[in-house]
Amino acid sequence: MTENNYGIRDIKNQHLKYSYKKYTDLIIGFEKHAKRMYDDWVIDINNRNIIMHKLDNLVRSMIKIYNECIMEIYNKTPNENESDNISNTNKKINNAIYNKIYNEINKIERIENKNNKLVDSFNSIREQLIELAKNNGFHTINDFIGLYVGENYESLFNNLDMETFELYKGVFVPLSISINKIKKKYRDTDKQDTITISKIPSKCDGLIENTCTVTITMNNIFTEIIFEGYVSADILNAYLRTSQIYSKHLFNVKNESKRIVKESYPHVDEYFIAKYAKLINSNVYFINNPDEMATKIDSDYMLFTDLTAKNFNTIVKEFVNSNLPTMFSYINVLLMGSNQDVNNAGLLFNLLKDRKIGSETLSDIIYHNLSFHLQIKLKKIINSIKNELGKIRSLTPEEIPIEKKLASMVNMPENVKNYIIEKNNEIKTGENNYKLQMAINGLMQFPWKPKDFNNNNYFQIKNSVTKSRNYLQNVAKKLNETVFGHENSKKVLIELVGKWIQNPESSGQVIGLVGPPGVGKTLLAKGISAALGIPLSIVGLGGMSDSADLIGHSFTYAGAQYGMIVRQMIKAGNWRSVMFFDEVDKVSKRNDTNEIYNTLIHITDPNMNQNFQDRFYSSAIDFDLSGVLIVFSYNSSEKLDPILLDRIKEIKISPYSLKEKILIAQNHVIKELCSNIGFDRDKINIGDDIVEYIIEKYTMEAGVRELKRKLEQILLKVNIDRFYMRGPFYNLLKKYNPETQSDDNSHSLEENQINMYVDYKPSLLEKNSDPNIINKIFNLDIDDHIIITKELVHKYLDKPTLTTEEIHKTNMIGVINGLYATSVGMGGIVPIQIYKNFVGDKNDGSNLKLKITGNQKQVMRESVMCALTTAVNVLNNSIKSKILDKFPHGFHVHAPDGGTPKDGPSAGCAFTTAFVSAILGKKINRHVAMTGEIELTGKISKIGGLMLTTGAKKAGIKCVYICEDNKEDYEIIKKKSPELFQDGLEIKIVNHIIEIITDPNVIIDIDVNDFDKDLISEFKKLK
């Protein structure tokens, strides 16, 4: 055998050893990777063993391949023509040549391995490692790229950001890998390679706020590699602290996010920002871009301010019912606060000592994900309370020693703590133990006024115009998102928030929302709570008569407990809260005394509500309610106690206009109903005209409750038709089966007997249709929509039950259109009829006797009397002298629909005009209506509102006369409901009855000479 031949075999042997060592290193790296995943709670012991088993098989395969290759190299027959005589000099020369060849082989392998051009003895090992890495990741990013592309992969990068690459290859742990080939139309070898970081949700419990994808594009080989994994712990935050020199990427994320927070989230305290960057685990800076990082800082700050304002018992209740990431966030942000906050974090952490996920305790997982500085803080506080909390083994807050609870409650007044300790010592075997424990628990859970307002949002923004303005804008935005309309209410709330910003310690406010049922008073209260970020508690007062329900029973009573006010404050868990008292005008009296109003007067007095007392505590405890925003809702302010009403800032909630109702139905109600019933909203077509038709013909309300019920009734019936292929679904079936024989299915829509469901028989069309088509129609997996028509509305809701009062058919003497408004904000016309009275005796001394019918109440009756006097006085003396002869028994005044009570002064000018018409015997234009209170002088006075004009147009009225003093109300309605004044409805503004009765558009063929000349002359002068 020649030396030359031995040299070639040595080269092959060296190359084999090199490859063997390379794959051995990769397998060992994968072994370490599996151990790291197990240690970091990414995989359990079973999955780790599966990976180890696969790696063990790879080692066995690799040894087998190596032995086979060695045998093949050294068992080959030597070349007989080779010379056996080689000098030492030639050996050195040849060794140099072999070495060069060996290096070139390795170089070729590194460059061309990407296309598998070199036959690698261990290629099967390589492929198995790549396959294993797809679902389990790899030791490092660069190890995998070296395996997949070749060790000389860096030479293939085209201007890649190597600093960022070097950073992430040192800290990022891949958990799964996907490889995509760049499509031909996007290939460009001159294009710069990129490395992109994107945050992703964690897929396992052990990883909290450190998961992301690292995507690397390599344009030279048309490949994109996506690594999904997590950033390994840098608990010292060394990378972040040295980022100014070490990493431009991290330094940019840190500084840019801080800038964005200051500009976009000015309410975030600068001290918190600085503390946050120092204490937070730097993993979050690796996985977030600057915008995302700024959002996270704001989110954590809002959580921090929320937690520091709550009492500890409330925090515990929320904490133990949260998921692991939320628990981590609670502890993480509390550790950044004051000593009291850190103490609370330690208490929460100890609650998790015995709680596990799999074989790992939640406390270990949370501790592992904290930064080093927070770990030290947590360790210190745990050691300081270890002896006191050593016996805690459950998650119930009741088992925490009461002394420790009191120590953690820095906001609780000292006299309250003394009271609790005193009552706690009294708890012995006896019948009052339950009440004593209730008294203690109530005080422990009550949200006392914070002693330190430094963490209060308003204190932190009050001196910055930008922060204050942005906060107000944010409140307004949240209100608009929560509540539709009600602009005046929102303005009042903005003013209140403005007061709180300038004086964070100022008292709350008492707001009264007055309006008809169903217009969103409760929703507005919820919107206030959401916009301010404070809790809402609701107290229903309807039918309540006993003040003890609100302020508690005396402790000595059997079954005594504290009242609803204290109970709702405990439920809210925050000194700043919204307390909503619903149906205030529906409370009941007790022994001719309204105890409820007396209690409400007490809690709304700003001088007294700081010392509110509950009878259950025998006047020993003062509860501070000064931070509560009290909101009352009622339908009418007339029923409220004047003293209580005087303390309320009243906001009138107007009924929704037709346009608003349609918008609410289309954008909210139908969407919600479709979701609840199981329809795709896009597949249900209920046009605005149909919604308007349902509103006008089937509902009589200020809000949208009945409208929602009617729409729900329609959709529920449509849903039943879906099961039986009836109605609109039958029509779709006919459309998709035009050639299929069908029958008349109309009877199924009319059928309402329960037997139709029991004895149902499919139609001939359904029997002859393709089942696949039927299922597609059933699931609305088609291009067509279900269109709700008037015909379907009639079938589902029956014929309309409401009728609109229309104007009389002809112009008549003594008959005029008055206007009415209901308690629900609806309006319309009410015909007023004045005729000669044929009952009575003109000689009985009761000249011009008035007979009033139609269920007219006291105020309306007085208005009729005033109208008659005014009508007579405006006529000339000649006509006056003939009235008694013409109407010997006076007048009969009637308002049709006697079953409906009618009251109020707003028909005064209508009565007057009708009297004038009856006396003169001249007809009144049937297309005219009017409203306004009449005075004896003929002046028309202001009425309560103009909502009664809303029904005039529907009734056929073309012209409405209103009082000049109501011009502002007219402008509001015109702005809110411009559609009312379209298509020819004219509004005339008047000040005196003369302007109406002398108008030929009102009384036909009227002659100005019929009236008192002096009165006409005086009116013209004033005009």
UniProtKB/Swiss-Prot annotation:
Similarity remark: Belongs to the peptidase S16 family.
Domain Lon proteolytic: residue ranges: 810-1003
SMART domains for this protein: AAA
One Pfam family per UniProt: Lon_lid
GO process terms (BP): chaperone-mediated protein complex assembly; mitochondrion organization; protein quality control for misfolded or incompletely synthesized proteins
List of catalytic residues: 906
Documented EC number(s): 3.4.21.-
Gene3D superfamilies per the UniProt record, alphabetical: 1.10.8.60, 3.30.230.10, P-loop containing nucleotide triphosphate hydrolases (3.40.50.300)
GO molecular function: ATP binding; ATP hydrolysis activity; ATP-dependent peptidase activity; serine-type endopeptidase activity; single-stranded DNA binding
Naturally occurring in which organism (per UniProt): Acanthamoeba polyphaga mimivirus (APMV)
Lineage: Viruses, Varidnaviria, Bamfordvirae, Nucleocytoviricota, Megaviricetes
Record keywords, A-Z: ATP-binding, Hydrolase, Nucleotide-binding, Protease, Serine protease
Positions with a binding annotation for ATP: 515-522
Protein name: Lon protease homolog
Record-linked InterPro entries: AAA+_ATPase (IPR003593), ATPase_AAA_core (IPR003959), Lon_lid (IPR054594), Lon_proteolytic (IPR008269), Lon_Prtase (IPR027065), P-loop_NTPase (IPR027417), Ribosomal_Su5_D2-typ_SF (IPR020568), Ribsml_uS5_D2-typ_fold_subgr (IPR014721)
Enzyme's top EC category: hydrolase
